[in-house]
Amino acid sequence: MRIDIITVVPDILKSPFEASILQRAIEKGLVEIHLHNLRDYTTDNYKQIDDYQFGGGAGMVMMIEPIDKCISELKSEREYNEVIYMTPDGATLNQKTANSLSLSENIIILCGHYKGVDQRVRDQFITKEISIGDYVLSGGELGAAVLCDSIIRLIPGVLGNETSALTDSFQDNLLAPPVYTRPSEYKGWEVPSILTSGNLPKIEEWRENQAYERTKKLRPDLLDDE
């Protein structure tokens, strides 16, 4: 998979890909991350990428020309499955979306800033708009990092245990069950005995029941979506 991220501040996006699972995925050649500074696609001496709104109003708007140049250059080199715009207006990121995007070969992610992008960018180039929640950040970079993490960990070979991602919360519209590790007793707090019994069918049944009860208590809305 190749992910091209268009941003005004590429430095924000360097560190997430230089550690842990994402770094290993890149080193294994399972994913390529390419950061594109939008200012490199400007034509003026000031490298301007934003301007005042037509009709007046507070806040600057990202200009269409440098975005067009960047996206068009990338598209001239390869085909892309999606051109994604990170925006609070978008559909909230969920596991279903991450699962779907993880099957893509090439993705472009555009990070918004200021009051957002000229609407013509959204009309002409964007195929999917994604939000990471009903709140506003200074830019789309952190959202892009979250999106990339949620996608990359699903690519076969990225995680050490191939079944690990399949048992994460939300994969079956359920939260994950409680998990425990050694020691089996600590300060009088004991691990449920079923988990140390060695009875795998009973353990699986316990986990399914716990996942359902936990979801019912903490996220009943997920059960309503079934």
From Swiss-Prot:
Record's subcellular location: Cytoplasm
Reactions catalysed, as given in the entry? guanosine(37) in tRNA + S-adenosyl-L-methionine = N(1)-methylguanosine(37) in tRNA + S-adenosyl-L-homocysteine + H(+)
Q: What is its EC number?
A: 2.1.1.228
Q: Name one GO biological process term.
A: tRNA N1-guanine methylation
Q: Which Pfam families match?
A: tRNA_m1G_MT
The record's annotation in PANTHER family points to:
TRNA (GUANINE-N(1)-)-METHYLTRANSFERASE (PTHR46417:SF1)
Q: HAMAP family annotated for this entry?
A: TrmD
> What is the annotated quaternary arrangement, including any partners?
Homodimer.
Described purpose of this protein according to its UniProt entry? Specifically methylates guanosine-37 in various tRNAs.
Can you name this protein?
Answer: tRNA (guanine-N(1)-)-methyltransferase
